[in-house]
């Protein structure tokens, strides 16, 4: 399945309440965002998903955002549409997020990953919605607003996710590695578990083995001190999800044998004991724990 967008073609972005949910084709993409027509302007660059497809906005009317395809590709399902965070009028989390979050907590979810967190206030709102249930909240850091308020977000979150996909759209790509390391380091210093996510093994959606660059990416995340590595499309729509998990397990495990956590912790100097109980052996060695399915249910914006 999917829709192919060709370079130079005209395409309309239409809110769900006008187009109807899930009615996308090569000329119209249905978007789950009610304020779409007011938050985009002529001249804007719009990217779909994690940035592989880009559109330029020609005009906006009362029914649709009219775009031209700059970089084409295949649109699968209902792709996320990136809108600059400083222009978002939609409150986060949305009312729908709060309802779904409560339902997931009541269903027994261990974690909720809260998307597009812009401040610690967003986490407090979600925490109030799921109270008194003790579900843990994962703050997805994927906007520059979140980077600006990182200290407060880390203090409020039960765990933090380095969501490199949308973060790499919000900022220049060359900044992503530095921001990733900064987020991981600050989480380690605060004793808050941190997850590194997005395109860890993207090639294995179709390939039986990862690229050398992906192998290095996983190992370097381990060496930086990440507590978890998360798979997304590789296991959601990939050809062989089990092989992906086994391969990541092997790479991450090998990296751990090379990491001197005692020396690494001494260099870091300010590592606090984590909020989650660990054994004395684990606390002294500062090991990395790899969670391939970080939570049973993720609260995602699709």
Task: Label each region the model flagged.
Residues 1-101:
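Beta-strand/loop-dominated core regions that host nucleotide or nucleotide-derived cofactor-binding catalytic loops
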Residues 76-77, 133-149, 246-255, 259:
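Conserved anion-binding
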Residues 76-87, 105-109, 161-166, 256-270:
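Gly-rich Lys/Arg/Thr-decorated short loops/hinges at beta-loop-alpha junctions or inter-strand turns
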Residues 89, 138, 189, 248-280:
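Long, charged amphipathic helices and adjacent flexible linkers at domain junctions
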Residues 89-198, 204-215, 219-222, 236:
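Conserved alpha/beta-domain cores
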Residues 213, 217-268:
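Active-site or pore-adjacent capping/gating segments
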Residues 281-302:
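Single conserved hydrophobic/aromatic residue that forms the stacking wall/gate
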């Amino acid at each position: 399945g999917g829709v192919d967008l060709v370079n130079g073609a005209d395409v309309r972005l239409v809110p769900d309440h006008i187009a109807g949910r899930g009615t996308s084709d090569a000329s119209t993409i249905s978007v789950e965002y009610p304020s779409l027509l007011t938050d985009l302007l002529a001249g804007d660059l719009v990217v779909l998903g994690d940035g592989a497809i880009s559109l330029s906005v020609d005009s906006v009317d009362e029914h649709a955002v009219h775009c031209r395809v700059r970089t084409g590709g295949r649109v699968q399902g209902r792709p996320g549409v990136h809108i600059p965070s400083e222009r978002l009028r939609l409150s986060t989390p949305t009312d729908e997020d709060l309802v779904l979050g409560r339902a997931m907590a009541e269903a027994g979810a261990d974690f909720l990953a809260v998307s597009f967190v812009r401040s610690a206030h967003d986490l407090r709102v979600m925490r109030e919605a799921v109270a008194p249930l003790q579900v843990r909240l994962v703050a997805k850091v994927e906007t520059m607003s979140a980077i600006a308020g990182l200290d407060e977000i880390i203090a409020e979150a039960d765990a933090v996710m380095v969501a490199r996909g949308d973060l790499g759209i919000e900022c220049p790509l060359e900044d992503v590695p530095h921001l990733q390391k900064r987020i991981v380091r600050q989480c380690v210093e605060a004793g808050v578990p941190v997850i590194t996510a997005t395109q860890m093994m993207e090639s294995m959606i179709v390939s039986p083995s990862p690229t050398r660059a992906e192998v290095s990416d996983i190992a370097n995340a381990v060496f930086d001190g990440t507590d978890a590595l998360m798979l997304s499309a590789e296991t959601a729509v990939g050809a062989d999800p089990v092989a992906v998990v086994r391969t990541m397990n092997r790479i991450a495990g090998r990296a751990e044998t090379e990491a001197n956590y005692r020396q690494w912790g001494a260099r870091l100097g300010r590592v606090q004991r984590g909020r989650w109980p660990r054994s004395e052996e684990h606390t002294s060695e500062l090991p990395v724990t790899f969670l391939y399915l970080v939570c049973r249910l993720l609260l995602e914006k699709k």
